Amino acid sequence: MRVADFTFDLPDELIARYPMAERTASRLLHLDGSTGALADRQFTDILALIEPGDLMIFNNTRVIPARLFGQKASGGKLEILVERMLDDKRILAHVRSSKSPKPGAEIILDGGFKMTMDARHDALFELSLKDDKTILEVLEAVGHMPLPPYIDRPDEDTDKERYQTVYNERPGAVAAPTAGLHFDESILAALKAKGVDMAFVTLHVGAGTFQPVRVDNVLEHKMHSEWAEVPADVVEKIRATKAAGKRVIAVGTTSVRSLESAAKASEGELEPFCGDTDIFIFPGFEFKVVDAMVTNFHLPESTLIMLVSAFAGFDEVIGAYRHAVEQKYRFFSYGDAMFVTKKAP
């Protein structure tokens, strides 16, 4: 397949640059993978689409304030976007500057915190903190929320809450698992009251999620690597859910990628997973774990629209996106959602 096959026309005014006033106020497009049928709904209708005994799996990563500003010793300004925290003192990061810093160069961040550039790994820089603070403490003190480029505005105080799920727990992501942004405490409580089971995996979303696909042939694309964990208790819940004939419903493409990474790494029965994954899901992929998913609307020609197309059918998903444009759904991270069931074999 060609990357250009996954394009669609999107008017700029449909890109959501702010969230709705209430998390659950978004719209929900239901795509039935078994029939290809579409239904326009409100997000709160998800309560009618999830059945007692179904297992919903969420990504509990926490977005860190990963964008830093500072200057080199020469006075030249630079911007740092953390890709990954290596430990309490070291990061891998993208650095934007008129001239790239050389190994040993000192960087002075806003707030006076100091870092040095230790090494370069292709497009990423390994930086170490020279203060008595930890990386997380410095990020919390002077970091900015790393809003996606298409939101096209500076981050604001409200983004610290709204570009974050209510169930976040483990710091490390530099982009939100956006399908989860629609859930608030009340709808989670209502799902539990209905008899829906819940579990949590972790995938620390990297800045690579915003990188465009730079090849023409889908098969030639190389995915960026991200750290993920599917714990043993989640595996046990999945096994029990499948044995009972109920569905595993992933909230977000990051949850999908975590679960299918565990399945790919397992020999035979699903096993726990912890480590880096660069799984690339595109049409032709055989899903082993996920039966349905909640997901936002993704960028044209992105690996995420490819993933959804693999799950529910290429023609069905492209048709759903065109319908969403016609019906003026809101797109991308702060936009509306889809509930998608797997296409019948």
Swiss-Prot record:
Transfers and isomerizes the ribose moiety from AdoMet to the 7-aminomethyl group of 7-deazaguanine (preQ1-tRNA) to give epoxyqueuosine (oQ-tRNA). One of its GO terms (molecular function) is S-adenosylmethionine:tRNA ribosyltransferase-isomerase activity. It comes from the Bacteria. It is found in: Cytoplasm. Its EC number is 2.4.99.17. InterPro entries: QueA, QueA_dom1, QueA_dom2, QueA_sf. This is S-adenosylmethionine:tRNA ribosyltransferase-isomerase. Belongs to the QueA family. Monomer. Pfam families: Queuosine_synth (PF02547). Pathway: tRNA modification; tRNA-queuosine biosynthesis. It comes from Shewanella amazonensis (strain ATCC BAA-1098 / SB2B). Keywords: Cytoplasm, Queuosine biosynthesis, S-adenosyl-L-methionine, Transferase. It catalyses: 7-aminomethyl-7-carbaguanosine(34) in tRNA + S-adenosyl-L-methionine = epoxyqueuosine(34) in tRNA + adenine + L-methionine + 2 H(+). Its main location: cytoplasm. One of its GO terms (cellular component) is cytoplasm. GO terms for biological process: queuosine biosynthetic process; tRNA wobble guanine modification. It is an enzyme of class 2 (transferase).
